Amino acid sequence: MVSDNSGNLYIVAAPSGGGKTSLVKKLIEMVGEIEVSVSHTTRPMRPGEKEGVDYFFIDEEQFISMVNEGAFIEHAKVFNHWYGTSVAQINKRLQFGIDVVLDIDWQGAEQIRHSYPDAVSVFIIPPSLDTLKERLMNRRQDKDNVISERMTKAQDELGHYPEFDYLIVNDDFEKAAMELQSIVIANRLRIEKQVNKQAKLLSFLLSSQ
């Protein structure tokens, strides 16, 4: 259980190629007091990625060992590679009043919601399947058969949108980024958050009547 003084937890999910990672990076750049939770994965490091920044890259034996130790709040196998979110990473930040955003898939989102029912979830969708395929091809990271597999899986993933609190269409990146930022800012201004954060001001204003 987290108090009203704790940070907020945000879940951002999308089908592969939906642009969630780029949108989350933009969110971190533009909004203060929010950090992305760095997941563990068994997949190979991609060009431009950094250890401990994009992911903690570990082998399958290490990953399974962490699962058995209860180190992950959620974990799932996606395209033959494991991904997991550290319990300690999330809780430590939330307890210090820092907002945390999770860049995960719908399976991970489902598991997170069971443990953190107050988490705010956002699903990112492409404007069309053709656009999604074009983005996957432009990444130049996967072979044609892998792209076909990702497209097939994407159609299944898109069917999970009703499980989320918010839906953003990533057609215009800047517009989508602003919409994601707006969700975070609006959630911070909810009464149950502000009543403690602004307790002194509210007390002063009311006592002055």
UniProtKB/Swiss-Prot annotation:
Pfam families: Guanylate_kin. Keywords: ATP-binding, Cytoplasm, Kinase, Nucleotide-binding, Transferase. It catalyses: GMP + ATP = GDP + ADP. Gene3D superfamilies: Guanylate Kinase phosphate binding domain (3.30.63.10), P-loop containing nucleotide triphosphate hydrolases (3.40.50.300). Its EC number is 2.7.4.8. HAMAP family: Guanylate_kinase. It comes from the Bacteria. This is Guanylate kinase. GO terms for molecular function: ATP binding; guanylate kinase activity. The lineage of its organism: Bacteria, Pseudomonadati, Pseudomonadota, Gammaproteobacteria, Legionellales. InterPro entries: GK/Ca_channel_bsu (IPR008145), Guanylate_kin-like_dom (IPR008144), Guanylate_kinase (IPR017665), Guanylate_kinase_CS (IPR020590), P-loop_NTPase (IPR027417). Its main location: cytoplasm. Essential for recycling GMP and indirectly, cGMP. It is found in: Cytoplasm. GO terms for cellular component: cytosol.
